[in-house]
Curated annotation (Swiss-Prot):
It holds the Pfam family Rhodanese. It comes from Shewanella denitrificans (strain OS217 / ATCC BAA-1090 / DSM 15013). The gene is selU. This is tRNA 2-selenouridine synthase. PANTHER family: TRNA 2-SELENOURIDINE SYNTHASE. Monomer. It catalyses: 5-methylaminomethyl-2-thiouridine(34) in tRNA + selenophosphate + (2E)-geranyl diphosphate + H2O + H(+) = 5-methylaminomethyl-2-selenouridine(34) in tRNA + (2E)-thiogeraniol + phosphate + diphosphate; 5-methylaminomethyl-2-thiouridine(34) in tRNA + (2E)-geranyl diphosphate = 5-methylaminomethyl-S-(2E)-geranyl-thiouridine(34) in tRNA + diphosphate; 5-methylaminomethyl-S-(2E)-geranyl-thiouridine(34) in tRNA + selenophosphate + H(+) = 5-methylaminomethyl-2-(Se-phospho)selenouridine(34) in tRNA + (2E)-thiogeraniol; 5-methylaminomethyl-2-(Se-phospho)selenouridine(34) in tRNA + H2O = 5-methylaminomethyl-2-selenouridine(34) in tRNA + phosphate. Transmembrane segments: none annotated.
Amino acid sequence: MTRQIIPSSEFASLFLQARPLIDVRAPIEFTKGAFPSAINLPLMKDSEREKVGTCYKQQGQESAIKLGHALVSGTVKEQRIAAWRKAIEANPSSYLYCFRGGLRSQLSQQWIKEAGFDIPYIQGGYKALRTFLIQILESSAALNSMLILSGRTGSGKTDFLQLRDEAVDLEQLANHRGSSFGKNLDPQPSQINFENQLAIAVLQHQTKHHRHLLLEDESFLIGRSALPKAFYNSMQHADIVLLEEDDEQRLQRLLFDYVDNKLASFVSRLGDEAGLKAFGDYLNASLNGIKKRLGGKFLQELLDSVARALAHQISQNDTSLHLDWISQLLTRYYDPMYDYQLSQKQQRVLFKGDHASMHAWLDELRK
């Protein structure tokens, strides 16, 4: 017989196995935050939940339960059960949850059982799962094992991290490259979803028993995704390794990241004409995003250089002229800012080297 309730002692394995989850909360609750392996098949829609909530406040629990049954009955009830059945048939090992593991979980489980399926619900619901993940991010195992990968803009930190098993890629989780030019076409996750995904990544890292958790040197905000405060504070005190790269390689990498790859993404999504226009708008918006730091005169120089590069690109099908403004941005903005920031934390630097020597040093550290 299938167990009726999944206890908190199994939360770690639930996330590590990416167990299929059926979230029976209302869509508005799901949108604010959920888990990567969850789908939203609500017991009550937003309007139904709101009516039941109002009834509960005014008339109490018994009246609210009666109203809930009245709202979700007949054809509506059959449709909800049919959606659950379809999901369970596709993933028979699914678990379900509501917000606290209370009436919504129990009622959904009962209706599903009456339809011929027997699946458990999660003890404590979403709130308990969320608390578990927050505790992972605040655990001493996570906070005391960090090693920070730093390096100048364009040094290839993200490419490097993706080759390291002991790394967690914060920018990938945030769906943002971290700089003014880091915005992607697809939206960033909600703050709660970002934190949940980060916690699961840290949990996965802990099962590998690495000595260090390798992270890229990030600001508190990655786009609009904020790192958890305790997690970020630990990053600010962790040891650092510096990834070095020659200037020409940095320029070519940024030409690909800021221009060639980004242009291809816009064109693929929007078509040639609309994609090119959106790409130009993206470059101008990215520069305007740091206009206070650049100053009006330098900003205008960069915008003019971008305009020339775009015109040359259109007429000659050649993006190389973009190297002019990228080079200016590096030498007059990014590099001085990085050098100043590094001067404040030199005492934390353990090692510096190019990609090959950094890999070798980290491999030795793991022994």
